[in-house]
């Protein structure tokens, strides 16, 4: 008779060992955890220990034991009841079924609830079938919505019915794990062909990883709108919190998190080699090499490596341009080097480190051009659903959308209503009541969808005594406000107040800078036990006596506000500030900004920070971009007060084919110096802007409903496809541009195809006028439900903005596309034709 299976037999020893290490480091925190573990079954206790052994310290401080118990109990139940789960390799089960954290989201109980909701729908299914079905359930419950950077918990995404892609994928991964399907989030940290990033989901079945779009169900795996986009990525990564690293190429760490290279599943790749040498030409061992892509007009890291004894670092990446920088500290001095490498044509490059303070020595300050090439469109995942599968999927997606829209219609967080409707029985509570709406108003839209009434109640109760000591706006924003940065909103004021005597509180009010001195003595930073983007709450810092530098800064603001001192993190640089004599003053002495940079805009370019230009300072061998979002040019001039040092200005012109024309300006500015620089944007020739993209076949309808293949419409020569949204300004604008150049466009009228939703659109004033002037334009019809999205994504323009205009040259061969409002599109179309 076969021996009974033992839960986590292979990993039991190392789990116990790592758990004991965590408990040894945080004995005060783990004492009550150990007591609760004794009441659990052996399997559940071991599962809990795994979570505690490999979670960031911030999780230990931020959440009670009961939150993690939900994940452990659900994981053990799956292992006991589902043979597929029990048959998983233990490392797959631990990391991708049991583990509670996906990325940097808030953690809340959800797994048991999700399993109860989904379980009956996947009975008898294998992992592949279950993954597809779970994604339909996810689409019924949530969809995409652009929000701020704080990442919601999975249960909050479920409740509010939407989230950005990082939140949709957190939600979907948790849904999959809740029913035993191994799942993880993967990221394109920055695209190379456009200014953005994207996250989606991978599931493990039949011994390998497959992908799917979160809340974007298909009838097959390895299919999503991003399939083509991912083939143009220079990096796609996953992350693992365990110290036992799965097979794969490590491309960096973020504290206790390891990043793994997943690009080979999505794109054509190659291995490149970077050699770093010192000034004498000798190999530099241990140099940090950063691989970066130009995105939002700054060089953004996508992978980091350290050089070996030969001074080399290797990376598997895509076939496009990388900005590669290297840094190293020797005897307290930082050395730096950088270059741009086109990996399509080059296999290796060499960097020679120089002291960063001499970065610009001997160089005349001037603009230097850099051509940045995006990888070509070359998808390696080409599976497509059959026509029957596509029809079935469309029907199911329509039903899912209807279910979700009904669910979220008029939804609001009941906790907000509970907070507003609390009965007022005392005079003090009557005063507080007048501030209830103010407190909710100062929160973000996202905060109002997942805040908890009891948490807000404590902040209101303990802040009200200070309401008459300052202006109302100051009190509401910088004392009453429970939000400091992107931390989890929790109670902390009562916990903070009990740590100080009456005399100590008054001393800290008299000199708020002393709060930071206390924090520095009491709270230690353990970056190797953290994830930099996961914040320890003020209460968590106090409980664990640990926290990152950012977490400690948030704690400073929390303590100050608890004591009635108006405080904040500066919105530009996150520096700690408190109010003194009506203005915010810094807690830590800043480096004096005793230099002035005068930037001249020129006449023709509209400069937008982090869109077509940025400026970065070189410190500690790394360029860090300045945060200038609120700064604007006035009369073509922008005055920037700067610290002395070495800087780099980047300008970038993104072309329709995804490539970029970049300009770099390196300069040094001395104390007291004023320097003038005129920003220069490189212009593109027509041939630089074109692409050859094979579009999928699609059907349009004639006036009588006859279907016509797009391949037939685009077969001979060049054509202009225009999907129009009548009587909306962007469509009206291009129609007016065409009529202003009536004679020129009339020569191409037979090659222009207008696509509208209905015959009534043709009767609207501007469109009917355009058709009267350009008599031979072809008219076709579509409901815009699917084709717009497919073509927009395929041509790498925003499918949510109309009109969608595509120029073709030959059968289904797109050479240019634009969407939305763009001045000068008419001129561009004439140039292309």
Predicted regions and their residues:
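Secondary-structure boundary elements
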Residues: 3-160, 390, 395-544, 554
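Hydrophobic/aromatic-rich core segments of domains that either
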Residues: 2, 116, 120-136, 145-156, ...
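Short Pro-Gly-centered beta-turn/loop motif in secreted/extracellular proteins
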Residues: 311-325, 329-332, 340-343, 632-657, ...
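A short, amphipathic beta-strand motif
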Residues: 270-281, 595-605
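Short, internal strand/loop/helix patches
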Residues: 768-802
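A short, hydrophobic beta-strand/beta-hairpin element that forms part of a small beta-sheet core
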Residues: 799-820
């Amino acid at each position: 008779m076969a021996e009974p299976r033992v839960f986590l037999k292979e990993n039991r020893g190392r789990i116990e060992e790592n758990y004991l290490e965590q408990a040894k480091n945080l004995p005060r925190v783990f004492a009550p955890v150990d007591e609760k573990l004794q009441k659990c079954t052996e399997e559940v206790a071991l599962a809990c220990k795994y979570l505690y052994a490999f979670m960031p310290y911030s999780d230990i401080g931020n959440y009670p034991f009961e939150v993690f118990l939900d994940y452990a109990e659900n994981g053990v139940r799956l292992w006991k009841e589902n043979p597929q789960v029990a048959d998983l390799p233990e490392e797959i089960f631990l990391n991708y079924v049991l583990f509670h954290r996906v990325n940097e989201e808030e953690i809340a109980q959800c797994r048991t609830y999700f399993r109860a909701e989904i379980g009956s729908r996947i009975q008898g299914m294998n992992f592949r079938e279950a993954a597809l079905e779970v994604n339909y359930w996810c689409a019924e419950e949530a969809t995409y919505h652009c929000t701020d950077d704080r990442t919601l918990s999975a249960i909050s995404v479920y409740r509010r019915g939407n989230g950005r892609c990082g939140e949709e994928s957190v939600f979907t991964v948790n849904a999959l794990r809740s029913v035993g399907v191994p799942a993880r989030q993967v990221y394109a940290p920055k695209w190379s062909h456009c200014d953005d990033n994207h996250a989606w989901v991978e599931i493990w079945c039949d011994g390998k990883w497959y992908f799917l779009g979160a809340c974007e169900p298909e009838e097959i795996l390895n299919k999503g709108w991003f399939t083509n986009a991912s083939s143009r990525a220079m990096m796609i990564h996953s992350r693992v919190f365990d110290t036992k690293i799965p097979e794969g190429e490590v491309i960096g760490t973020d504290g206790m998190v390891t990043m793994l290279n997943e690009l080979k599943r999505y794109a054509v790749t190659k291995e490149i080699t970077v050699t770093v040498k010192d000034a004498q030409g000798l190999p530099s061992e241990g140099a940090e090499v950063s691989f970066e892509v130009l995105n939002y007009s700054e060089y953004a890291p996508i992978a980091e490596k350290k050089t070996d004894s030969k001074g080399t670092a290797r990376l598997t990446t895509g076939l496009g341009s990388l900005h590669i920088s290297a840094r190293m500290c020797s005897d307290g001095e930082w050395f730096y080097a950088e270059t741009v490498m086109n990996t399509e044509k080059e296999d290796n490059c060499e960097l020679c480190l120089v002291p960063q303070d001499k970065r610009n020595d001997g160089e005349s300050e001037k603009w230097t051009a850099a051509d940045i090439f995006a990888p070509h469109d070359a998808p390696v995942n080409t599976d497509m659903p059959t026509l029957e599968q596509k029809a079935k999927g469309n029907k199911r997606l329509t039903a899912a959308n209807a279910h979700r829209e009904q669910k979220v219609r008029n939804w609001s967080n009941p906790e907000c209503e509970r907070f507003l409707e609390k009965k007022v029985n005392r005079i003090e509570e009557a005063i507080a009541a007048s501030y209830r709406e103010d407190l909710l108003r100062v929160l973000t839209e996202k905060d109002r969808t997942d805040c908890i009434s009891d948490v807000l109640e404590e902040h209101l109760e303990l802040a009200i005594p200070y309401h008459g000591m300052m202006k109302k706006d100051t009190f509401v924003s910088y004392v009453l406000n429970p939000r400091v940065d992107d931390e989890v909103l929790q109670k902390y004021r009562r916990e903070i107040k009990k740590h100080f005597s009456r005399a100590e509180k008054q001393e800290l009010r008299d000199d708020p800078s002393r709060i930071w001195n206390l924090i520095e003595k009491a709270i230690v930073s353990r970056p190797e036990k953290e994830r930099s983007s996961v914040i320890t709450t003020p209460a968590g810092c106090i409980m664990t006596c640990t926290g990152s530098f950012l977490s400690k800064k948030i704690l400073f603001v929390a303590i100050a506000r608890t004591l009635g001192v108006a405080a904040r993190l500066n919105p530009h640089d996150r520096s700690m500030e408190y109010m003194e004599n009506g203005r915010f003053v810094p807690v830590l002495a800043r480096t004096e900004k005793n230099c002035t940079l005068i930037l001249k805009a020129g006449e023709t370019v509209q400069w937008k920070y982090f869109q077509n230009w940025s400026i970065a300072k070189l410190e500690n061998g790394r360029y860090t971009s300045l945060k200038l979002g609120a700064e604007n040019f006035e009369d073509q001039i922008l005055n920037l007060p700067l610290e002395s040092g070495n800087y780099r200005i980047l300008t970038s012109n993104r072309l329709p084919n995804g490539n970029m024309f970049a300009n770099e300006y390196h300069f040094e500015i001395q104390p007291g110096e004023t320097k003038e620089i005129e920003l220069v944007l490189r212009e593109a020739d027509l041939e630089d802007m074109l692409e050859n993209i094979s579009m999928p076949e699609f059907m349009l309808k004639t006036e009588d409903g006859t279907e016509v293949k797009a391949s037939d419409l685009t077969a001979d020569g060049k054509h202009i496809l225009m999907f129009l949204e009548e009587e909306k300004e962007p469509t009206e604008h291009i129609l007016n541009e065409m009529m202003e150049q009536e004679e020129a466009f009339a020569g191409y009228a037979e090659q222009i195809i207008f696509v509208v939703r209905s015959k009534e659109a043709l009767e609207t004033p501007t469109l009917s006028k355009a058709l009267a002037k350009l008599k031979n334009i072809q008219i076709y019809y579509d409901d815009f439900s699917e084709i717009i999205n497919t073509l927009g994504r395929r041509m790498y323009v925003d499918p949510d903005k109309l009109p969608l205009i595509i120029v073709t040259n030959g059968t289904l061969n797109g050479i240019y596309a634009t969407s939305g409002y763009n001045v000068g599109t008419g001129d561009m179309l004439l140039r292309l034709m």
